Amino acid sequence: MDGLNAAEQRELANRMERKQMKEFMTMYSKLVQRCFDDCVNDFTTKSLISREEGCVMRCVDKFMKGSQRLNERFQEQNAAMMQSGQLPGR
């Protein structure tokens, strides 16, 4: 971002923010769909039954822990690549 003027930096920041929001919404949508498909199968009531609610809670927890673990590994790999000078574009 060093070679950009203030307007270009703002535009880049706005684009990055929109991209992050889109990625978040995509991840959220996939989580909802996956947990719904895996856990909800009784459509005789408009509320979740206790078994479904427990399943959804475990599904969300598992997804969040997996995402956190993946993010940690990505950060470790990125740090290792930066330290060894293997980061793309450098």
Swiss-Prot record:
Record's keyword terms, sorted: Chaperone, Disulfide bond, Membrane, Metal-binding, Mitochondrion, Mitochondrion inner membrane, Protein transport, Translocation, Transport, Zinc
Subcellular location: Mitochondrion inner membrane
GO biological process: protein transport
Domain of life the protein comes from: Eukaryota
Cystines in this chain: 35-59, 39-55
Cited Pfam families: zf-Tim10_DDP (PF02953)
Record protein name field: Mitochondrial import inner membrane translocase subunit tim9
Organism for this UniProt entry: Emericella nidulans (strain FGSC A4 / ATCC 38163 / CBS 112.46 / NRRL 194 / M139) (Aspergillus nidulans)
